[in-house]
Amino acid sequence: MACYSPRCDSPYPYADWDDCESVSSLGSFGCDYDHHEEASFQDPLAVGDDDVFEEPERVHGPIVDICKVDRMSEEEERMAIATRKAKEVAKELSETMSGKLRWLSDFTCDKPGPKRRKKKGLSMVDYPTLGSEAPAGSRIKMSKIGKGCTLVMASGGTRVEGSHPLVREFNGEKPPKNVGRKSGPAWFGYLSAKNATDKKTGSKQSDKEVEDDWTFVSKKGKGIQPEDAKPQGVKHQHAIRRDDRHRHGMRGTRYGAPNYGYRYQQQQCPVQGQQSRGQWQRRHCEGEGQWTQRRPAQQQQRPAQQQQRPAQQQQRPAQQQQRPAQQQQRPAQQQQRPAQQQQRPAQQPPQKPLRKRKPPPTNQRIVKPQKPKTPEPQPPQQDWFDSV
């Protein structure tokens, strides 16, 4: 059945695989295939043989829709040209508008502006000249406008990328909110044609202000007042919440004192000034203000430490006195503990806050224990372990 090339006459046809490189699966079934002339095999699909691959006949008739324009009347032809031009104009307009609006998503629009202005309205950055001379890809020319001016957008146009409140409202992502006015969105100047009548004042805009259906409305009696252009979250009424006053929120009002933005005012706190320092320490976070409780205890430990020094000075002359000197140190350490125990009842119990503030408890009120009569401490010499 299967015919192999005479070089591969072993009982296992693929035993010598190095000699039989040209043997293929097709060659084992059809003997008329020449193994040594592989290029003579032609793919019927590649040649396009009609017997192997038939395709339906292509009808090369004239397409009627292409030639239809010639047979149209002049009016229809004019309409077709007008619609085509309108589509091109609309496409070009959308490109230019997206180019003009690119400044809104720029990072400079989110900056709060110069430091002297505390309002969070539209910042006084350089606004673009909305002329058509700047191509869509290039950087838009900037020009300053007046301090109280507001940018008013025309209706229509493409979506704008950006998280600025005006951008999001222009895209229609959030519903307009009443800011400082009885009705209407936060900005409403949808001017769709030149010399359009402003909706609020009814006055006609001049040709200089209206340019490419985009308008800068100044605050001199025309159009939108600058209060209307603020982003949604900022309302400048006089009744302002305390946590809006500073960026740290209500942090300073924890103790009832209106010290905005300051963390802790221990000395000037008018409400809870009567409480002792142990109460202050309990209110603080860990590691904050705990030194106030340790201070009196440290001053009571000092006479106990002065008792340790003569004990060390007695150790210096001879090493045999180390052990009795260490036994003298132990009662000195035991005197530290009652010194700390004396300090705890010395705190005042929390009283009701009075209007007059008493001075805080100082170290002078604590009765210092009498120093035991010891020889005066000598000037510091070498330590006893250095003399060994």
Curated annotation (Swiss-Prot):
Keywords on record: Coiled coil
Protein name (database record): Uncharacterized protein 89R
Skewed-composition ranges (Basic residues): 233-251
InterPro entries cross-referenced by the UniProt entry: DUF5892
Coiled-coil annotated residue ranges, if any: 68-96
Membrane-crossing segments per the record: none
Low complexity: compositionally biased ranges: 265-279, 293-346
Residue ranges with Basic and acidic residues bias: 166-176, 196-208
Region (Disordered): 162-388
